[in-house]
Amino acid sequence: MRDRRNNLAKLNTLVFGRDLRITKGEPYPHIYEYDFSSYYPEENYIYNQDLPEGKEIFDIRFYGADVRNDDNALFIQKAVDDAAKVGGCVVVSGGNYVTTTVFLKSDITLFIFRDSSLSSNKTGEGYNHLGIVHCDSCRNVTLTGGGKLIGNGEYFGRKPLYDKNIIEHSEYIDVIEMRKKYRAQLRFAHESKYGGVLYIKNCTDIKADNFIIENSAHWSFHIENCNGVEIKNFVINNNRHVANADGFDISGSSNVSINHCFVSTADDGICIKNALWLGNTNEMKNISVSDCEVISCTNAFKIGTETTFDISDVTVSNCRFFMTDIYPGTVSGIAIESADGASVHHIKVQNISMNRVTCPVFIRLCNRNRASTVDGSSANAVEFGKRKKRASSAAKDRFHQKGSIYAVDISDVTAENIEIPVIIAGYKQNEKSFYVSDVTLKNFNLQYAPYKEVYDKRRFIPEYVDVYPESWRFRNLPAYALWTRHVKGLKLLDFVCGVPRSTWKEEIITEDVI
């Protein structure tokens, strides 16, 4: 164990919550070694594919698209418009085509051959945060072919604090040091950032099969207010240090399946959100994730943090969550959060393997109540490199203390090289406790990374009621297997955690658990 913290280390602890963020400087397009994962199994997910039979073909080259053009949007859009009249297939073949936003329409197939791609420009002009491919109020749209959408993410982030990525683990397990080094490697947004790569909203019956997104500058594949989305054989391969580059973001949508996909990204791998400021208005349900590999610097699978409206009936199964090459590892493998008033319930997770995931499971109910401080414009300000603005109209009481988490069943989890315990926490505010309820953890086998522990024993652990929920928020907890607070109906069945090296911590700590 490390000696007790000296005065400098204590000061570092006090400023732990400060937001290390680079806010000045021009875009920095240089790619560091290990920005992209060395493990990239494209051949396991993507295959050579023939054009669909029975569909009329609309090749973008026939409309004037050329790999030498600075912007092919007009030519691609004309092909889309004509294909939509007959339910045709828009074909991208013969190389990489730079384009500003292309708007898909109902009843078409976008087919990008495996050797071809559509890519963003390197200025960010011409997108209006709509992404490279945008699909609004459409039905019956298919994306396929084995080709790519390329986001050129590094052209829209500032130089990170560090001049190279960290690949060696610290001598100690220390959450404070992890967070500092993680943020020092991030490329925070320049104001030129255009948005994500693929954005579908208000759509029904969408299919994406045999498709690649590469190097997004923001959310890679955003699914907003949709019903009936099927994604399989899909690859997202991003720069792991471009801030806010999520993999899949599902917001306000129901009946969505993500099957047999690979994600390597800087921010959340697969994320479910449902929030007022995202333009969501209804509950969302019936989301399934299966047979996926996820490399994420933050959370491999996450519900949250944006959660004003209810989320239920979510299943995650047969997945592998892990980190390669760089330090620190993934923040959390499974994160289930209600921060802004949503009821999150009937969540089932089973058969998950993890390696180099700092916190295997993080379940957190709190009262951030973000709808009282932001609207759609202000919520995006920081993410797009602009000054944070307060919302013009606040919904202070609408979602205050309304959130809940219950009926969570997680089973058959194997995790190697973890660094902090499973965390389950409700909150206490104004002398009233709000509980996470009815959680079952079954067949867990957790093993610690072989490093020394920092000694960080505190007299009390704050509630952190109204701040951003993250497993790192609680810092170096005094339990190594499980730390719980404000929980009702917790069941542990065959829950095993190996004892970490020379630990000073207790195995399990329960506080206000009934």
Where are these regions (language model features)?
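Extracellular "leader-to-stem" segments immediately downstream of a signal peptide or signal-anchor
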Residues: 1-109, 113-202, 207-209, 218, ...
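Short, ordered loop/turn segments at secondary-structure junctions
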Residues: 63-65, 115, 123, 226, ...
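Alpha-helix capping and helix-loop boundary segments enriched in small/acidic/polar residues
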Residues: 67-70, 245, 249, 258, ...
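Conserved short loop/turn motifs at secondary-structure junctions
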Residues: 92-99, 247-249, 276-277, 333-337, ...
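Short glycine/acidic-rich loop motifs that flank beta-strands on beta-rich extracellular proteins
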Residues: 100-101, 121-123, 129, 152-156, ...
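Right-handed parallel beta-helix
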Residues: 114-115, 139-148, 204-215, 227-239, ...
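Extracellular beta-rich repeat passengers
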Residues: 307, 326-514
